[in-house]
């Protein structure tokens, strides 16, 4: 009965979305290991996302789309610089040094990092004496502790490699070196920080331009241009832009159309139905599938440090989300002391969505 009335539909969709994102990270890692420039991947990925979402934005929001002024365009340009270009630059470069598992673990930290940055820049106020405030702070600190554990402790391998796979790793072993592993984790954390900063910037932009799909298309378009320029500044070798390997082409099309196109639409729908915290709960699914794909597709070893560190990050994420839920209930009870139920929360989420405060996350790393 629960499935028939549609209550399980958002759950199934979020599991599928995070599975798709985990697969995308594993495939992109394989392409990076093949020698493709990480900014070339970012450029093509954002370009495909732009082409995929443009028709959806045009038809879906044509009646509600406000005028796109020069001021909003400038804000979207800088939002794209932080949320698309710099985030993709750090994440993909960090991914080339580490693994898809670690990349997804750092992505899982984004809500906590965004919260910390909101406190630093005084965008959000918090009552440290309340249980909700203490829970959110504790969750954020645990996430950061998990990130440090991922960075500083690699641990022993939990899986064995066959002789052929060992030979392949010897030929491409830069990610196996401890110093490169640490550099990769630092880059992934920088990517998470850029992504968290973008959340705060885009929240302000959404107040003036609350059309999520149109905003995403403009962001992706600006991000495409910016990533292309960053790539050309780093290397002017035109041959780097010519992709001949079928796996490279399929991976980039999949990453753009599915991971940033379809997943954007699906996540947006789930936010409308169940709220942003509901969608955040499924982030660990991407981490689990990334680990499986890392092992099954890339044939990489799974290390103790990755498992323990990822577990700490996920534990911190759930502590943070529980604190956030409690805070939302406390705020609602202050306004309506005798009323708080799922219907009220869904109405509040829908109202916030219309105002642009609940946004889709188009720049998935």
Swiss-Prot record:
GO CC annotation terms, alphabetical: membrane
Organism lineage reads as: Eukaryota, Viridiplantae, Streptophyta, Embryophyta, Tracheophyta
InterPro entries membership: EamA_dom, WAT1-related
Q: Enumerate the transmembrane spans.
A: 8-28, 40-60, 72-92, 101-121, 132-152, 181-201, 213-233, 249-269, 277-297, 302-322
Q: What are the alphabetically sorted keywords of the record?
A: Membrane, Repeat, Transmembrane, Transmembrane helix
Give the signal peptide, or none.
Answer: none
Compartment(s): Membrane
Q: Which residues form a coiled coil?
A: none
Q: How does it sit in the membrane?
A: Multi-pass membrane protein
Origin species:
Arabidopsis thaliana
Q: Which GO terms describe its molecular function?
A: transmembrane transporter activity
Where is the EamA domain positioned along the sequence? 25-144, 196-321
Judging by the UniProt lineage, the source's domain of life is Eukaryota
Q: What is this protein called?
A: WAT1-related protein At4g01440
Q: Which family does it belong to?
A: Belongs to the drug/metabolite transporter (DMT) superfamily. Plant drug/metabolite exporter (P-DME) (TC 2.A.7.4) family.
Q: Keyword Repeat on this protein?
A: yes
